[in-house]
Amino acid sequence: MTQAKAIARTVRIAPRKVRLVVDLIRGKQVGEAVAILRHTPKAASPVVEKVLKSAVANAEHNYDLDINSLVVSEVFVDEGPTLKRFRPRAQGRASAINKRTSHITLVVSEKKEG
């Protein structure tokens, strides 16, 4: 089975927030997945939609796959490098703020007949 992949690296959204969105489209057909992402009011939705469109374009251009038969076969989010920042607090102290990043990997493949 031929599959096409797209990866977005170091996206400035925390992985646990992106996972909420990618869990909605796992196993869905591409058209349905795009519709779900368009109607999901989360900051990660447009980013995941862009990765999905990239994977579909890769499938069409690199592997000559039929875009109507594609499904989101695999999608996962890994943690990227963390940006460490400090927030001033009372009494001259400072608290660490971790600004987390994500690596989003999305794989589309042709749906099996039957």
Curated annotation (Swiss-Prot):
Function in brief: This protein binds specifically to 23S rRNA; its binding is stimulated by other ribosomal proteins, e.g. L4, L17, and L20. It is important during the early stages of 50S assembly. It makes multiple contacts with different domains of the 23S rRNA in the assembled 50S subunit and ribosome.
Report the coiled-coil segments: none
Q: Which family does it belong to?
A: Belongs to the universal ribosomal protein uL22 family.
One GO CC annotation, please?
cytosolic large ribosomal subunit
Single GO MF annotation: structural constituent of ribosome
Q: What is this protein called?
A: Large ribosomal subunit protein uL22
Q: Does the keyword Oxidoreductase apply?
A: no
Keyword vocabulary terms for this entry:
Ribonucleoprotein, Ribosomal protein, RNA-binding, rRNA-binding
GO BP annotations listed: translation
> Subunit comment for this entry?
Part of the 50S ribosomal subunit.
Keyword check for Ribonucleoprotein: yes
Tell me which domain of life the UniProt entry assigns to the organism this sequence originates from.
Answer: Bacteria
Identify one Pfam family in the record: Ribosomal_L22
